[in-house]
């Protein structure tokens, strides 16, 4: 067993060796290095064919038509293209968008930008288990609502929203529905030929592919129109200009092909490892799982250890790679906005750790992590006057702290 142990697969994944091997074929002079937009020679044709094959693999995993896949630089760009592209194109129809307070920053920051442009955004509060209230969603849809954007699985707490039902609600009210499926693609079955989803964002590096490439699914029937946010050459049917990075696209395609093949066996294995971790930690006093345990990704566990400061716990756990808050924003010392939205107080939100297991995680690593977390929590609580007060039965919420 090698230290440190990587338990942060929701932040990124190593690239699968099979993917690396495939990508290497599309880089050097001996390989297939052509530009897929070069229509006049074999180098271009071979590159174009490789892109088509990858596009098909990606479409197959999510039950889409390959013509509905638009390549982007990642899920952040896909989210930007979906929200800005739709809202700007349909602004004569309406200027109202609905999302949720626990969305990824790629959605929330894009919504803030749209608000600066004069659009109106409604932010739904999640319930305490992280799920949105579908009745509340119905009640906030207006005549001028153009788009609803609700993520499939949350990046911090792994909670899975019912996108089938949300899609039905949106289709009934003639509102477009976008979902950010970055965390769920390849982990949960998604069949877009059955789901009423108009736009879906996905990433490659959360599924053992390379960083710097992602895609946006744009439904053809009923047709969804977008205003491009990047211009120059009209690639990707005018929706996203720029020379296609063939090696990255091939890598993403191969990663998605492998995921489709292995999902049925891999997800039960990951869920068993996650449950093993949970069972090893749940008996520690004053620990709370954040988010629904039923409607949840099989590889995610987000736990708050009360009376332990999250940052010091992370330092004590330097032999395991975990995160507090989400990867993009965990450099800030603000408590996680996702956990705050669930109604957790600052202390509990600050003491949360996200564990996410993946393809290379072993049972031995999980057992090591359990031992490490238990001793770290015990040690830090021994140093904590708050823990002593709690053990003495003092209600910490009733204490008036003075600020000097």
Swiss-Prot record:
GO molecular function terms attached to this record: 2 iron, 2 sulfur cluster binding; cysteine desulfurase activity; metal ion binding; pyridoxal phosphate binding
Domain of life: Bacteria
Keywords tagged on the record: 2Fe-2S, Cytoplasm, Iron, Iron-sulfur, Metal-binding, Pyridoxal phosphate, Transferase
InterPro entries linked to this entry: Aminotrans_V_dom, Aminotrans_V_PyrdxlP_BS, Cys_deSase_IscS, Cysteine_dSase, PyrdxlP-dep_Trfase, PyrdxlP-dep_Trfase_major, PyrdxlP-dep_Trfase_small
Pathways involved: Cofactor biosynthesis; iron-sulfur cluster biosynthesis
PROSITE patterns given in the database record: AA_TRANSFER_CLASS_5
GO cellular component: L-cysteine desulfurase complex
Active site residues according to the UniProt entry: 328
A Pfam family annotated for this UniProt entry: Aminotran_5
Catalysed transformations (reactions): (sulfur carrier)-H + L-cysteine = (sulfur carrier)-SH + L-alanine
HAMAP family associated with the record: Cys_desulf_IscS (MF_00331)
Family the UniProt entry places it in: Belongs to the class-V pyridoxal-phosphate-dependent aminotransferase family. NifS/IscS subfamily.
Assembly information from the UniProt record: Homodimer. Forms a heterotetramer with IscU, interacts with other sulfur acceptors.
Protein name per UniProt: Cysteine desulfurase IscS
Species the sequence originates in: Histophilus somni (strain 129Pt)
UniProt lineage: Bacteria, Pseudomonadati, Pseudomonadota, Gammaproteobacteria, Pasteurellales
Gene behind this protein: iscS
